Regions:
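Residue-level signal for inorganic ion chemistry
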Residues: 44, 168, 225
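Conserved beta-strand segments of alpha/beta enzyme cores
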Residues: 26, 78, 107-109, 203-206
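SAM/dcSAM-binding transferase cores
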Residues: 217-265
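Conserved Class I SAM-dependent methyltransferase catalytic core
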Residues: 28, 33, 37, 162-218
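Conserved SAM/SAH cofactor-binding pocket of Class I
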Residues: 40, 46-149
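Short, low-complexity, intrinsically disordered N-terminal peptides in bacterial proteins
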Residues: 1-22, 98-107, 121-129, 261-265
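Mobile active-site "lid"/loop adjacent to the S-adenosyl-L-methionine
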Residues: 139-167
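Class I SAM-dependent transferase core
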Residues: 4-51
Length: 265
């Protein structure tokens, strides 16, 4: 996902323009600071079925990586990039304005809104009840006790506030239609908190452990669950990212470059 040179107007002078899905779409991202999208966002996007057709909310979208990855792979998907940080929302708008993303622009929008809002405040911000068929989220999942960053933009993107999973899944349950889906990526240590937050809201949770290499412990989990279902969770076969070296496995490469879905659907 190399950075490419581009014209950078005004307050985007510190942006890099980065290719994803082997050039299927591009992102404007802050250079040398803040959160920069990578494999996590691409794997999360892979949790959406290739044949998905409907409205999808990318909650905490940042510059738009996961949502635009869905739009690039699913030609009938309509995506809203939801981001509360004004600076990152500006990068998401810049991403949509890139000429390389012209084919996606008619199916994607940016909404500056706080995912933790509730009730009338949430609806007034543009997150209306039952407006979406699918929601994805890559929320901050570093504990506040973890090594702190001196980069405020990065810290806002990475540090988990109290009851975050409860607040974010509450919003997802409000905006996703019954029978729709939520997919999220997190650390394995958060599994209990996530399942607790999903309880009574989303069921049939399919859990995919993400391993750097076959012999190494999982570093991420992907969970996909159905709104309104009472079905129990299921542990799925893992996704192994790398061979013994740093090259991606064929399965991981297909998912991360938009030619396959994580669940094979």
């Amino acid at each position: 996902m190399p950075a490419e040179a581009a014209d950078r107007p005004g307050d985007m002078a510190d942006a890099t323009i980065d290719a994803f899905h082997r050039g299927a779409f591009f992102l404007a991202q802050p250079a040398g600071r803040g959160h920069r999208a990578g494999l996590d966002a691409m794997i999360l996007a892979g949790a959406v079925p290739t044949g998905f057709a409907g409205n999808l909310a990318d909650l905490g979208a940042g510059a738009g990586a996961a949502g635009l990855a869905v739009a690039a792979r699913c030609p009938d998907a309509r995506v809203v990039l939801v981001e509360r940080d004004a600076e990152m929302a500006a990068y998401a708008r810049r991403s949509l304005a890139l000429p390389q993303n012209a084919a996606l622009r008619g199916r994607a929008d940016v909404l500056a809104a706080d995912v933790t809002l509730s009730g009338e405040a949430r609806a007034a911000a543009g997150l209306c009840d039952r407006a979406f068929d699918f929601a994805i989220m890559n929320p901050p999942f570093n504990a506040s006790a973890d090594r702190a960053s001196f980069d405020d933009l990065r810290k806002r993107a990475h540090v988990m506030p109290p009851d975050m999973f409860g607040q974010w899944t509450r919003t997802a349950a409000a905006i996703v239609k019954p029978g729709g889906f939520l997919a999220l990526i997190a650390r394995p240590a958060s599994l209990e908190a996530i399942l607790s937050a999903l309880a009574g809201r989303f069921g049939e949770a399919s859990i995919v452990p993400i391993h750097p290499r076959a012999e190494e412990d999982a570093i991420r989990i992907i969970i996909r669950a159905r709104h309104g279902s009472r079905g129990g969770p299921a542990l799925c076969p893992p996704l192994v990212l790398h061979h013994d070296g740093n090259a991606l496995t064929s399965h991981a490469d297909a998912i991360c470059n938009g030619t396959a879905s994580l669940f094979g659907d």
